[in-house]
């Protein structure tokens, strides 16, 4: 008696979303971000708020913050990620984390800019180089928090919120082909296939492709920050961080589509740490104003705006590839 492998019925391509469905879906994103912002601006402020006479949210700059504050803030981020994943379901595995971090940007906005740290560095006996080194170390702390949040968020999504709707919505025809098993390596199709083939990166092993993708994404983000981050105003700083890592991740994804998303996300805090160390000897051109662009943002700015930008850039590249496939790799 022989057994045959069970087969599943092919999934037809879904009909395009109606205008009302798009509005409702994006309204859920807005609600998730607002709830996350309320959580971090109230409870999170009690954990990470700067001293009354200063400003700027930092895990290491102020002596009243320690590992306990970082641990509690991580737990709060995990809770916000779970709530946001529930609100935006069904969606991609990292949309809950993206909404939670965008809400966490409210904590950064409430905390103020890096101006107070610049003033502190200009006091007698102080050195901005030491402050920049501390901020670079803080970026590594945020990188650890990111790894914990990304891993927990992915496990939570796979356990409770796993779905294929986001793949079908990203590319109806190729998404259906991917889920039905008729095409392999669908994320490597279209523009991503053309770019990776032309650059010769298509068949790179992952242990080579991942570091190259991180270096390329970091270099592009550094260039975009140089162009976009022209002031220390918090809104402009957050927008510059989001746009820089969105563009860099999208472009590098097309060259390295097989590199997993954690590598692109880790590029954000590592790029910020490298930027702090690179500009640690920059002098203030005017009192309270830094001439080096990357030092106009705090680590929390890179974390709460840069990582959502990288997430949206990654999935924009995924969507672009699925929508523009005229050529596919051999099975």
Task: List PLM regions with ranges.
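Aromatic-anchored segments of alpha-helical transmembrane domains
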Residues: 42, 104-112, 219-223, 268-280
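Membrane-interface helix-loop-helix junctions at boundaries between adjacent transmembrane segments
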Residues: 82-179, 197-199
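Membrane-helix interface "capping/anchor" motifs
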Residues: 78-100, 251-266
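C-terminal transmembrane helix-loop-helix hairpin of multi-pass membrane proteins
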Residues: 132-137, 254-331
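Hydrophobic alpha-helical segments embedded in the membrane of multi-pass proteins
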Residues: 219, 239-250, 266-269
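N-terminal signal-anchor module of multipass membrane proteins
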Residues: 2-78, 308, 327-328
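Membrane-helix interface and helix-disruption motif detector
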Residues: 25, 44-70, 88-94, 121-140, ...
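Membrane-water interface at loop-to-transmembrane-helix junctions
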Residues: 24, 185-220, 224
